[in-house]
Each structure stands twice: as structure tokens, then as C-alpha cells.
Regions:
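Structural motif
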Residues: 22-25, 137-147
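Helix-centered, glycine/charged polyanion-binding patches within enzymatic domains
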Residues: 70, 75-141
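Short, solvent-exposed polar/charged micro-motifs at secondary-structure junctions
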Residues: 1-5, 105-107, 146-148
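Charge-patterned, long linear interaction tracts outside catalytic cores
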Residues: 150-159
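Hydrophobic (often cysteine-bearing) scaffold residues that line and stabilize catalytic clefts
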Residues: 54, 116, 148
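Polybasic low-complexity intrinsically disordered regions
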Residues: 1-90, 98-99, 151
Length: 159
């Protein structure tokens, strides 16, 4: 939450003030964008300031994936233009959950999206249980090290 945002010395400015639509609240800090395998092991991730939208880091995250892979995302990753450019640049298909007023995905993509949604939510809850939202680091480098350690622990937990 943004209660202590003015007192924070590690990060300053409006770049770190974001809005979480799922929780319908504002927050101050970072967003973690994570790509996992169907077994829940992290493959690629990036930390982004809270202000920026979900589609900003998706090109960077998909460059490490082999061509022909399909990435499933939530409603924040809905963009036909970005999905087409990612497919052209890296050969990775981006399938995002559609909003109610949009044309639905193909039936097999919807079926796979529902199947992998449980894995996505499980990984998110595991990260919350590890205390990722309450990391108390003195420097930004220390914060990044703690995020690395949490993701390493997650990959070991999901072997």
C-alpha cells in the first residue's frame, strides 16, 4: 500500500506508484513479471516499476524462450499487435485470457488456459508465502538479491 511511499528512500517518484486492478488498490514499488514452466519452475523474470503496464516487459521475457513455445497470460497481456510482433520476432505464441467484451480465443487455447491457470495461481501464492511482498532490503541491489533467492527457492521447491 502507499501509506509509507513518501518516506521510502530506496525508490522515489511517480514511476513506482502503480494500480492493481485485481485488488482495486494502488501500491508503491515493483511488479514481478514471471514466466514459468507447466510444473511451476521459473524460466524468465523481470522487475518493473509499478507504473508501467504489463505488456512493457513481455518482449524481453520471451527472447530467452525457444521458438514454437506457447506462453499463457492473464488479461493484462491482451494485445493483438504485441502478440503478432512477438510471434514474428521470437516464434513464441502469446495467448492471453480475453475480457468479456472481446472475441474469445480458440476452444483448445481456452482449455489449455484454464488448465494452466491453476499453476499460475499456485506459483503466485507460493511467492506470497515466501514473503516476496514484504522484503526488507536496505538497498536496491539487496532487494534484487532477495528476489533472486526467492525465485531460486521456488525452483527448488517445484522440482
Amino acid at each position: 500500500k502507499r501509506v509509507r511511499a513518501r518516506r521510502c528512500r530506496k525508490v522515489r517518484g511517480l514511476d513506482f506508484c502503480g494500480y492493481c486492478a485485481a485488488k482495486k488498490e494502488k501500491f508503491f514499488g515493483w511488479r514481478l513479471h514471471l514466466i514459468c514452466t507447466p510444473q511451476g519452475r521459473p524460466v524468465s523474470y523481470t522487475l518493473l516499476a509499478g507504473r508501467y503496464q504489463d505488456l512493457a516487459p513481455i518482449h524481453e521475457l520471451t527472447f530467452v524462450l525457444p521458438p514454437g513455445v506457447t506462453v499463457y497470460g492473464d488479461k493484462g497481456y491482451v494485445s493483438a499487435d504485441d502478440a503478432a510482433s512477438i510471434l514474428a520476432d521470437t516464434g513464441v505464441r502469446l495467448i492471453a485470457a480475453r475480457r468479456t467484451n472481446m472475441e474469445p480465443n480458440e476452444w483448445h487455447d481456452e482449455m489449455n488456459l484454464k488448465r494452466y491457470r491453476k499453476t499460475i495461481e499456485t506459483v503466485n501464492s507460493q511467492m506470497e508465502k515466501m514473503g516476496l511482498q514484504r522484503l526488507h532490503a536496505r538497498t536496491n541491489e539487496g532487494f534484487e538479491i532477495k528476489v533472486h533467492a526467492s525465485l531460486f527457492a521456488l525452483s527448488l521447491a517445484n522440482l
